[in-house]
């Protein structure tokens, strides 16, 4: 999995993580796609690192909104989407 794949899948989520409100269906589809692409521990760690980079590079991200995304979409992501997540511990 590449950061390009992660960022293109999660582009529809940017307005939600900045401003809240309803999560767009395209955003949930993107989270599902990333989760399905990240099948191995190495892929999950790579996706985690990409998410950390993305959340740090987008101004105005609300960390609570970012962390709530998987639950709001009904997707089980095995780590918290947060700039402080230690991706090395992701299994």
Swiss-Prot record:
GO terms for biological process: lipid transport. One of its GO terms (molecular function) is lipid binding. Disulfide bonds join 3-50, 13-27, 28-73, 48-87. Keywords: Allergen, Disulfide bond, Lipid-binding, Transport. PANTHER family: NON-SPECIFIC LIPID-TRANSFER PROTEIN 2-RELATED. Belongs to the plant LTP family. Plant non-specific lipid-transfer proteins transfer phospholipids as well as galactolipids across membranes. May play a role in wax or cutin deposition in the cell walls of expanding epidermal cells and certain secretory tissues. This is Non-specific lipid-transfer protein 1.
